[in-house]
């Protein structure tokens, strides 16, 4: 249940009755200060200005036509024309009880869509590195969230599984097989790629064979396709190990690599020529876009086919957009890649639309993200300046979490301790990233992310475990608890109840904008509000049984909300810490 949406609809209806245009916006927002209510409608002044009316007089007209008696206990006009909304405690109790009994905490599926989410996208025959982390975990959090909201989500792992380098890789794989190299040697993909490149650069006979294999692979030669498939499978098996460690939902079934779109490319280029969009320039085929200018102020040229007949990433991305609309029947396609890809994606999609391959109703969204930086403010590297392998980063996270947990005086079994170490180690890396606005760069800092204070995974995981411990101290039957009446009298109870009912607002924002940090911020605020409630309002030692049960209901919904929210982020919780 989305309070903001409900209030927006009702206030807009009243604004229209009072004379505003149908396109008006109530601009309902959560209030920053209690004295200004729980929500504020800030759109009155703009509507009044259009009508040539006094804003406060128009605000009164809106109130006269506003039906909010069940939701709000008080409405007031403030300042030049804001409407402050104070929610009704009786309504809050009803909605809290409804959320507790609903499997999705009161969130109903509406306007179901098919959404393709393109994320992770590592390259074949190369190991995943830290540069793949953001796309993988941000994309996965959004995929989980959209599924939770009732949408049909199609995960598309757009792996780099095609290109001229595959002739070189197939030739080297063949050489290894002929020399009876063990399978283990293939497990070090970086070394495999490096050796293949070395042979290509230094051995002309090898290089010629590699070039021949490129031609054969592209023409569908069975032997080359088999060798190529083996390279893809070996790579994706290793990637799957990283995905499993990261608690990411991607599987081999989600692989939709560049090769998938290969058969489409010649006909797309031919069609772009027929439509007059692509023209020849120095042997290459180029689409000139008036919407983008080069340094001389002329329309920018985007190459869709090289002089040698080869296709480019732009051509593949045009085909991918077309495929996702025509074949996958998607309503939206979200691509999670770094900000440096923004112009490339916008150009590919502009050509896609100009060619009529997708309608305006099909939403193509580049969810760009910034870089992970070291403490020196430069791109995150190893001490020697090399690229950090993702597996090495996760290993270090586990090592640091092990030291952290061993320092704590815990009464956990070895299995319980290991579960906590895994949850905190991997969770810390993920949460540190997810809690930052994806469009900005952020500094990777082990000390901050492993802290039990602040907006971190350990703090959030501990907040959940702390609430679980309350229920471990009571033998109250869950059915009896759900049936018990809920009363909201204390201000701390009221604040907690409202924050709990704002869960859907945060989740809907993540689904719409692709911004998991909004959910992180919500969960952190919720944990802080619960902590204040817990200190101020005794639960197990409440003055009577009815207050105890009522507060336990608030605690139970907080526990469920924290767990569900962290699950959407792909962060594991533990029952004991």
From Swiss-Prot:
It is found in: Cytoplasm. GO terms for biological process: arginyl-tRNA aminoacylation. It is an enzyme of class 6 (ligase). It catalyses: tRNA(Arg) + L-arginine + ATP = L-arginyl-tRNA(Arg) + AMP + diphosphate. Its main location: cytoplasm. Its EC number is 6.1.1.19. Monomer. NCBIfam families: argS. This is Arginine--tRNA ligase. It comes from Haemophilus influenzae (strain 86-028NP). The gene is argS.
């Amino acid at each position: 249940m989305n309070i903001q949406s409900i209030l927006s609809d009702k206030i807009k209806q009243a604004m229209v009755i009072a004379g505003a245009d149908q396109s008006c916006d109530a601009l309902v927002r959560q209030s920053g200060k209690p004295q200004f209510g729980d929500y504020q409608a800030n759109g009155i002044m703009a509507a009044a200005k259009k009508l040539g009316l006094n804003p406060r007089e128009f605000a009164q007209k809106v109130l006269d036509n506003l039906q909010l008696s069940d939701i709000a206990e008080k409405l007031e006009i403030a300042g030049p024309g804001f409407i402050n909304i104070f929610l009704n405690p009786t309504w809050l109790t009803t909605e809290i009880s409804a959320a507790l009994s609903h499997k999705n905490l009161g969130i109903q599926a509406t306007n179901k869509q098919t959404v393709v989410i393109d994320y992770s996208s590592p390259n074949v025959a190369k190991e995943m590195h830290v540069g793949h982390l953001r796309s993988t975990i941000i994309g996965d959090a959004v995929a989980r969230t959209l599924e939770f909201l009732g949408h049909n989500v199609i995960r598309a792992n757009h792996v780099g599984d095609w290109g001229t380098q595959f002739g070189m890789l197939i030739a080297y794989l063949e050489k290894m097989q002929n020399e009876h190299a063990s399978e283990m040697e293939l497990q070090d993909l970086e070394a495999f790629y490096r050796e293949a490149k070395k042979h290509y650069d230094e051995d002309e006979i090898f290089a010629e064979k590699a070039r021949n294999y490129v031609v054969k692979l592209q023409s569908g030669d069975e032997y080359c396709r088999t060798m190529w498939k083996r390279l893809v499978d070996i790579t994706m098996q290793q990637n799957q190990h990283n995905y499993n460690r990261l608690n990411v939902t991607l599987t081999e079934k989600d692989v939709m690599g560049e090769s998938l779109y290969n058969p489409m490319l010649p006909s797309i280029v031919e069609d772009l020529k027929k439509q007059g969009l692509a023209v020849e320039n120095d042997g290459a085929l180029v689409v000139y876009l008036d919407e983008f200018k080069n340094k001389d102020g002329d329309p920018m040229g985007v190459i869709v086919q090289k002089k040698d007949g080869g296709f480019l990433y732009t051509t593949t991305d045009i085909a991918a957009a077309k495929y996702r609309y025509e074949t996958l029947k998607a309503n939206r396609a979200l691509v999670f890649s770094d900000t440096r890809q923004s112009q490339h994606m916008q150009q590919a999609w502009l050509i896609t639309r100009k060619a009529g391959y997708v309608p305006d109703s099909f939403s193509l969204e580049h969810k760009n993200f910034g870089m992970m930086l070291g403490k020196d403010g430069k791109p995150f590297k190893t001490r020697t300046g090399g690229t950090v392998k993702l597996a090495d980063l996760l290993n270090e996270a586990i090592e640091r979490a092990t030291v952290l947990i061993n320092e704590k005086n815990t009464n956990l079994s070895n299995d319980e301790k290991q579960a906590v170490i895994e949850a905190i180690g991997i969770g810390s890396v993920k949460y540190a990233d997810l809690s930052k606005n994806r469009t900005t760069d952020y500094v990777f800092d082990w000390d901050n992310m492993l802290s039990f204070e602040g907006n971190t995974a350990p703090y959030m995981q501990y907040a959940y475990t702390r609430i679980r411990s309350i229920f471990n101290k009571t033998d109250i039957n869950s059915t009896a608890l759900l049936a018990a009446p809920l009363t909201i009298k204390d201000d701390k109870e009221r604040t907690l109840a409202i924050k709990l009912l704002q869960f859907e607002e945060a989740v809907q924002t993540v689904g719409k904008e692709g911004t998991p940090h909004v959910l992180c911020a919500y969960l952190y605020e919720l944990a802080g509000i619960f902590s204040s409630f817990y200190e101020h309002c005794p639960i197990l030692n409440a003055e009577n049984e009815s207050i105890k049960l009522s507060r336990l209901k608030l605690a139970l919904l907080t526990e469920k909300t924290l767990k569900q929210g962290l699950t959407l982020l792909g962060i594991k919780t533990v029952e004991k810490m």
